[in-house]
Regions:
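Alpha-helical transmembrane bundles and membrane-interface segments of multipass inner-membrane proteins
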Residues: 1-124
Length: 124
């Protein structure tokens, strides 16, 4: 779509949106650790009983695995979405999944905190 987005080929050795260039093995280890912990929590912890939390973690994990596959086999992540209407980093669908899942997770946690605070307040 001219003036909005274009497809390009970019090799990203950093993390989401080309941040922190380099450190391939560190990012692989970190991604594996976080992914495994999320999956364990999804199936052993509270994640299984709450659809919002389960969805948020699942979207984060799916994006992380997508980028992890590229990083392990290629040494970099292939980014291809370039928003031309704003000066922004080139990114991919997995980056979108991690970002949207994280936003959803933060919203869930805020909602959960406020719900607990309201529960603790005495009724007038």
């Amino acid at each position: 779509i001219k003036g909005v987005v274009e497809f390009v080929y970019a090799q990203n050795t950093g993390v989401a949106f080309s941040l922190f260039d380099g450190g391939r093995w560190f990012f692989i280890a970190l991604t594996l650790a976080v992914t495994v912990l999320c999956i364990i929590y999804m199936y052993k912890g509270k994640g299984q009983s709450n659809l919002w939390l389960f969805w948020s973690l699942g979207v984060i994990v799916s994006g992380a695995i997508g980028n992890l596959i590229d990083r392990i086999f290629l040494g970099y992540v292939i980014d291809f979405i370039n928003p031309t209407f704003v000066n922004f980093a080139v990114f991919n669908i997995a980056d979108c999944a991690v970002t949207l899942g994280t936003i959803s997770l933060m919203a869930y946690l805020l909602f959960d905190i406020f719900k607990k605070e309201n529960k603790d307040e005495p009724a007038n």
